[in-house]
Swiss-Prot record:
A GO biological process held by the record: amino acid metabolic process
One Pfam match: Pyridoxal_deC
Organism (species): Petroselinum crispum
GO terms for cellular component: cytoplasm
Name used for this protein in its record: Tyrosine decarboxylase 3
Catalytic activity as recorded in UniProt: L-tyrosine + H(+) = tyramine + CO2
This enzyme's EC code(s): 4.1.1.25
Gene name in the database record: TYRDC-3
Length: 516
């Protein structure tokens, strides 16, 4: 056997030591290169086709089969980003991106994300990074106050907020908490009797969460909505469904109401729905993923009336609040319900701070153990722009949507299909624009072709939905770089493609585009 003396006497070369991949000056140099690259990208982002034009499998065909054995320079890597990666990106930050919902970025959000990534802490409990936990406590309370949430949702009122990754995670956590709370009362064997309620406009995240939580698919109630009610969840239909389930020996568990549905941004009637839900002891979650951010503006706060009777509430700051993905804000009235369902306390995580019960361990408020320092970027956004400018940011997009809605109304070939509440307009080519094409299936097909034609052009990007059997084009405004000129240009693109699509066989001679 060798001795310690023999080991220390061995001559070691520098190659036997780990390489230094975080040398401060080299980090500074490469960091400047990266900032310059991104700044140049944003300067010319409008010049790229909004939606990627590549075909499936394009990247595997142009990248090597194996990872490089020797190091490559950042300059070389960035060159490949420019020539190989950017062509395969759909540019969500383009001012001509009007699809889905916005993923609004900002300098403050990016820099906060950079700092969080640079610190690279893993804040699963208070002890491992007190600032990460406590800043999250602070910013969720700040945001909650901006929304005028009831004090019972704030840490100062016995509730509290947590930053999840996405709405899917937030809904899953609250559904699991509701499930376990109910089963502790009714017995674990009754999981097959639990029923979840929503509307047919509710985000699919709830259905996925219900599957994961073990809810019988037969007990998932997506209650039908109607055009006459603007696709809102009807309280009477909800109560009828609950009573039917009770009569059949089932256990009503959970209601998800929505403020700003994905398809049309309609708002469910929270006061009436929560009244019904509380009558039958359901957990109520309010999903305001998109439209919740608008409710920091006094003129939109009315849409949260009734939230005081909910058990949980969430919104995505990474949609319409200048904060980078991912950042879903979840507030709960009773944190102990989450903790009872999600807590783990193995020996290797035990510590004096946690045992005092005076700190928050966010690992017990989420599915994962490890977690990112998300609070930094939200803190940067709140401080860099302030409540006043954030409100004006929201109002600017709403104003542009009103303008676009007016443009649609002036062209007699088109119609707005659902009321515009926030910054998204749902519209279509209407049947009267086509001679002999009054069948809805044919009208839907024309609108589908219009969407495909516009998106294939790369000039703008829009998405679709189906409302009451009607194929609808969704025009969602929310990009940080978007201004009124982009909205006007987008409408011109839509009109031009409609002109090409509606040839003389379908377009009445008497219809003249009054805007041309």
């Amino acid at each position: 056997m060798g001795s310690i003396d023999n080991l220390t006497a061995q001559k070691l070369t520098s190659s036997q030591f780990p390489m230094n991949t975080l040398e401060p000056e080299e980090f500074r140099r490469q960091g400047h290169l990266m900032i310059d690259f991104l700044a140049d990208y944003y300067r010319k982002v409008e010049n790229y086709p909004v939606r990627s034009q590549v075909s499936p499998g394009y990247l595997r065909e142009i990248l090597p089969e194996s990872a490089p054995y020797n190091p490559e320079s950042l300059e070389t890597i960035l060159q490949d980003v420019q020539t190989k990666i950017i062509p395969g990106i759909t540019h969500w930050q383009s001012p001509n991106f009007f699809a889905y919902f916005p993923s609004s970025g900002s300098t403050a959000g990016f820099l906060g994300e950079m700092l969080s990534t640079g610190f690279n802490v893993v804040g699963f409990n208070w002890m491992v990074s007190p600032a990460a936990t406590e800043l999250e406590n602070v910013v969720t309370d700040w945001f909650g106050k901006m929304l005028q949430l009831p004090k019972s949702f704030l840490f100062s009122g016995g509730g509290g907020g947590v930053l999840q990754g996405t709405t899917c995670e937030a809904i899953l956590c609250t559904l699991v908490a509701a499930r376990d709370k109910n089963l502790r009362q009714h017995g674990m064997d009754n999981i097959g009797k639990l029923v979840v309620y929503c509307s047919d406009q509710t985000h699919s995240a709830l259905q996925k969460a219900a599957k994961i939580a073990g809810i019988d698919p037969k007990n998932f109630r997506a209650i039908e909505t109607t055009k006459s009610s603007n696709f809102k969840l009807c309280p009477k239909r909800l109560e009828s469904a609950i009573l039917y389930d009770l009569q059949n020996g089932l256990i009503p568990l959970y209601l998800c109401a929505t403020v700003g549905t994905t398809s049309s941004t309609t708002v469910d009637p929270l006061p009436a729905l929560t009244e019904v839900a509380k009558k039958y002891d359901l957990w109520v979650h309010v999903d305001a993923a998109y439209a919740g951010s608008a409710c920091i503006c006094p003129e939109f706060r009315q849409y949260l009336d009734g939230v005081e009777n909910a058990d949980s509430f969430s919104l995505n700051a990474h949609k319409w609040f200048l904060t980078t993905l991912d950042c879903c804000c979840l507030w709960v009235r009773d944190p102990s319900a989450l903790i009872k369902s999600l807590s783990t306390y193995p020996e290797f995580l035990k510590n004096n701070a946690s045992e005092t019960n005076k700190v928050v361990d966010y690992k017990d408020w989420q599915i994962m153990l490890s977690r990112r320092f998300r609070a930094l970027k939200l803190w940067f956004v709140l401080r860099s722009y302030g409540v006043g400018q954030l409100r004006e940011f929201i109002r600017g997009h709403v104003g542009m949507a009103k303008y676009f809605e007016g443009l649609v109304g002036l062209d007699k070939r088109f119609e707005v299909v659902a009321p515009r509440l926030f910054s998204m307009v749902c519209f279509r080519i209407k049947p009267s624009a086509m001679i002999g094409k009054n069948d809805e299936n044919e009208v839907n097909e024309i609108n589908r072709k219009l969407l495909e034609s516009v998106n294939d052009s790369g000039r703008i990007y829009v998405s679709h939905t189906v409302l009451g059997g009607i194929y609808v084009i969704r025009f969602a405004i929310g990009g940080t770089l978007t201004d009124i000129n982009h909205v006007s240009a987008a409408w011109k693109v839509l009109q031009d493609h409609a002109d090409a699509l509606l040839d003389d066989a379908f377009l009445p001679k008497k219809i003249v585009n009054i805007l041309s």
